UniProtKB/Swiss-Prot annotation:
<dbReference type="InterPro" id="IPR039119">
    <property type="entry name" value="ABT1/Esf2"/>
</dbReference>
<dbReference type="GO" id="GO:0005730">
    <property type="term" value="C:nucleolus"/>
</dbReference>
<keyword id="KW-0698">rRNA processing</keyword>
<dbReference type="Pfam" id="PF00076">
    <property type="entry name" value="RRM_1"/>
</dbReference>
<keyword id="KW-0690">Ribosome biogenesis</keyword>
<dbReference type="InterPro" id="IPR035979">
    <property type="entry name" value="RBD_domain_sf"/>
</dbReference>
<feature type="compositionally biased region" description="Basic and acidic residues">
    <location>
        <begin position="8"/>
        <end position="27"/>
    </location>
</feature>
<protein>
    <recommendedName>
        <fullName>Putative pre-rRNA-processing protein esf2</fullName>
    </recommendedName>
</protein>
<dbReference type="InterPro" id="IPR034353">
    <property type="entry name" value="ABT1/ESF2_RRM"/>
</dbReference>
<dbReference type="GO" id="GO:0003723">
    <property type="term" value="F:RNA binding"/>
</dbReference>
<comment type="subunit">
    <text>Component of the 90S pre-ribosomes.</text>
</comment>
<feature type="compositionally biased region" description="Acidic residues">
    <location>
        <begin position="28"/>
        <end position="78"/>
    </location>
</feature>
<feature type="domain" description="RRM">
    <location>
        <begin position="110"/>
        <end position="193"/>
    </location>
</feature>
<dbReference type="InterPro" id="IPR000504">
    <property type="entry name" value="RRM_dom"/>
</dbReference>
<feature type="region of interest" description="Disordered">
    <location>
        <begin position="1"/>
        <end position="84"/>
    </location>
</feature>
<keyword id="KW-0539">Nucleus</keyword>
<dbReference type="InterPro" id="IPR012677">
    <property type="entry name" value="Nucleotide-bd_a/b_plait_sf"/>
</dbReference>
Length: 296
């Protein structure tokens, strides 16, 4: 029944669309022809609708997969960030035995003072030269020009070198002092002399204390200078505010504001100018005429 109603509706719609002049010609056609065409159109419409739905489903699946991939990437980034976070290292207190061992090791170590370091000699090369004679544990070198940039600052003026054995450090200082460094023929520092001195009863913590005290003094000087500059700035600001306040008072009372006094002084004439002015014009003419005669 439903199909018959659909067919009747299709026929009536087609009749309404057809021009009345051609109605008789279309009435002669069989009803089956219209039925077949309508069925084919209906099937094609259904198939097209199914294809569109499948395409939409595929697009939804692709979008969903992309969202899942983005979420997975975000999770991986978060994991990487968590792994990058520095772990807090808890420092455990040392045992008494370890403390004793460290004290013994530090007591056995010896330090040599190097008063002059050749130009263009880097710490790695210096350590390589001294490591031939004994094991070097620590080094501290002072730059010659602190204000110079780091990538151009290759000059050191003095240094402290710590050896593992103090007896060996004493021997190295006595033997190598005022002796050429040696090396290959093309080496720049081949003919440079060692300037070494062994420091008895001098340990690495003494050097650290000295450096810390120097740093503290430098920081104190900087703070004092900064405080002085701040005080000067505050005084200037107070003076400016006072001048503004005074000007506002004068304006409210109707008094004229005093202009700043600019003092100018006449410059005295010099002794040479006075002598030149005293010379008469006749004398000048004679001098000029004599010069012209000599030239001719």
């Amino acid at each position: 029944m439903a199909q018959k109603r659909k067919n009747d509706k299709i026929e009536t719609s087609k009749k309404e669309e057809i021009d009345p002049r051609f109605v008789n010609k279309f009435e002669d056609l069989e009803e089956n022809d219209f039925k077949d065409d309508d069925e084919d159109d209906f099937i094609n419409d259904v198939n097209e609708g199914e294809e569109e739905e499948e395409e939409e489903d595929n697009e939804d699946n692709i979008e969903f997969n992309q969202e899942e991939d983005d979420e997975d990437e975000d999770d991986e980034e978060n994991k990487d960030n968590k792994n990058k976070i520095k772990k807090v290292i808890k420092i455990k207190p040392m045992d008494i035995e370890k403390m004793k061992k460290l004290k013994e090791q530090n007591e056995n170590k010896g330090i040599i003072y190097l008063s002059t370091i050749p130009s263009r000699m880097k710490p790695a090369k210096l350590k390589q030269l001294l490591a031939k004679y004994g094991k070097v544990t620590r080094m501290h070198l002072v730059r010659a020009n602190v204000e110079r940039k780091n990538h151009r600052n290759d000059m050191f003026k003095e240094g402290w070198i710590e050896f593992e054995d103090k007896a060996l450090a004493r021997k190295i200082a006595t033997i190598l002092n005022n002796i050429p460094m040696g090396g290959k023929a093309r080496d720049i520092h081949k003919d440079c002399l060692w300037n070494l001195r062994y420091l008895p009863k001098f340990k690495w913590h003494h050097l650290q204390d000295k450096l810390v005290s120097q740093r503290m003094e430098r920081d104190k000087k900087l703070r004092l200078e900064i405080n002085q500059v701040r005080k000067q700035n505050l005084i200037l600001l107070e003076q400016v505010e006072l001048s503004k306040h005074v000007n506002q008072k004068h304006e409210s009372k109707g008094k004229p504001i005093k202009e700043k006094v600019v003092r100018t002084f006449k410059q005295r004439s010099s002794h040479e100018d006075s002598l030149n002015s005293n010379i008469s014009s006749k004398v000048l003419e004679k001098v000029v005429s004599n010069k012209k005669q000599k030239i001719n």
